[in-house]
Amino acid sequence: MHVKKYLLKGLHRLQKGPGYTYKELLVWYCDNTNTHGPKRIICEGPKKKAMWFLLTLLFAALVCWQWGIFIRTYLSWEVSVSLSVGFKTMDFPAVTICNASPFKYSKIKHLLKDLDELMEAVLERILAPELSHANATRNLNFSIWNHTPLVLIDERNPHHPMVLDLFGDNHNGLTSSSASEKICNAHGCKMAMRLCSLNRTQCTFRNFTSATQALTEWYILQATNIFAQVPQQELVEMSYPGEQMILACLFGAEPCNYRNFTSIFYPHYGNCYIFNWGMTEKALPSANPGTEFGLKLILDIGQEDYVPFLASTAGVRLMLHEQRSYPFIRDEGIYAMSGTETSIGVLVDKLQRMGEPYSPCTVNGSEVPVQNFYSDYNTTYSIQACLRSCFQDHMIRNCNCGHYLYPLPRGEKYCNNRDFPDWAHCYSDLQMSVAQRETCIGMCKESCNDTQYKMTISMADWPSEASEDWIFHVLSQERDQSTNITLSRKGIVKLNIYFQEFNYRTIEESAANNIVWLLSNLGGQFGFWMGGSVLCLIEFGEIIIDFVWITIIKLVALAKSLRQRRAQASYAGPPPTVAELVEAHTNFGFQPDTAPRSPNTGPYPSEQALPIPGTPPPNYDSLRLQPLDVIESDSEGDAI
């Protein structure tokens, strides 16, 4: 009951409003506010009132302008960067090493036999076209060639370039002769790959400025088609094993061997080996700078067994990266040359970004709308993994198969000429698509916490001419138990990886403008220009609420009056009285209220006394204008 009473009082208070007019509210505010200026508007003479009114408006506008600048600066989410450099005990980076040749030619040769023969025929056709006709009928497997052939483009006539096929008749109705091709080769025709759709209705040409580039890219594309049809375990067995590649290992003062490395299969480089990856064991620390406290390796790359057309670079591909991160060694790695000792001084850059809304980065990639196809390796998120997963996803959706160089989701197949004849055309279009790259870049985010390794590299010949004899003897005996030298300078690589004197550099972001900075500047501007405080803002908010309150009450009253006017307009005359309404219910004959005048009646028949009712009218609550509880509450309020 008491709650209902208080609610009714509150409702009546809302209906009555503040009890002031607009003018009274303004006068009250100017007289009672703690802000300088408004008081002078109502206390001074007419001229000073006008002056203080203009000054108050001017300074209020300045305050609002300054507030807008500070709020816009705060919402720009700017950051400040702090840099710290020093030396401390840190985890040694994970080191990934790969051979430049992904496979041993002696083990993969049977898979590449047809492709190698075709490659040799192409070289003969390019280098000695007048001699290649004698071998034109040689037994070649043209099924590979027909999917993606190499062509010569004669652009001596830029308005009508000619496309010359290396094998068979020329296209576009062109005549074919060895002489014309010889002249074309002598003058340097461009070589290109012709990529066509399944029904050959759409064909594109991928041009190259050098025949070396064209032949290398064409061979890799065809080899990709072959490797995609071979189980990965067989490819692992055809690559370089760790016990043959890693001849010697030393970390600090502790010896190590190939068993301390984790093996993964990387499509570009075959078997790769990772030291100190931290997947199953704790990361190894390093507390001192210099080569004596780093990692030392002697590697045998077996250059004599390289695939001739697949690996044109000899050496070791290596990369330093963080523990539990996937090594994208093709994009971020470096080469170490055979026959040299390569020393690498390491400086660790730790980047710590603020995250949303200051920078579009992610902590673990959970909010990135791209399925991570590298999740099977149980590695941390990286933007490289996201970009490649995004490309593979587009490849599967557009070409119905995945590229051999990237991991596959479950249930999908790698692209090959047998199952997907037009995959090369689709892959080329997707690879050159700017829209696809922009889409993936827009969806993938950088990691908020990133570690980069800056390397200072120096090289020297190793071993020297004076010591190579005994060094190769010892290494050959350890590897093959042979008294003869089975190693050579062109197959040996020595690596030294260590921390520099200053081994870390931390680059950390922090908010340039926080909420404390914003409130301080807002209050400072308000206090400087108008002498106000937070309480002054509360007073101003109160007067705004009262203004809105009065306006709402006036609008409600106006709506009621308009409704009443519409109701009155629906009647022809004045509204009926209560007596007329009662008479309408009892006078079923609709007789007139006054009897007809007789000659004996007086001049004023309406003055005739009406009959007195025998019983008083019923005491209906509906005849009251207000409920009893409202009347009682009003009376109690007046008494209070």
Curated annotation (Swiss-Prot):
Phosphoserine found at: S633, S635
Keyword Cell division: no
Subcellular location: Apical cell membrane; Cytoplasmic vesicle membrane
Means of activity regulation: Originally identified and characterized by its inhibition by the diuretic drug amiloride.
Molecular function per GO: ligand-gated sodium channel activity; WW domain binding
Record topological domains on the Extracellular side: 72-532
PTM info: Ubiquitinated. Can be ubiquitinated at multiple sites and undergo monoubiquitination and polyubiquitination. Ubiquitination by NEDD4 or NEDD4L inhibits the ENaC channel through endocytosis, intracellular retention and degradation of its individual subunits. However, some studies could not confirm the ubiquitination of this subunit of the ENaC.
Protein name in UniProt: Epithelial sodium channel subunit beta
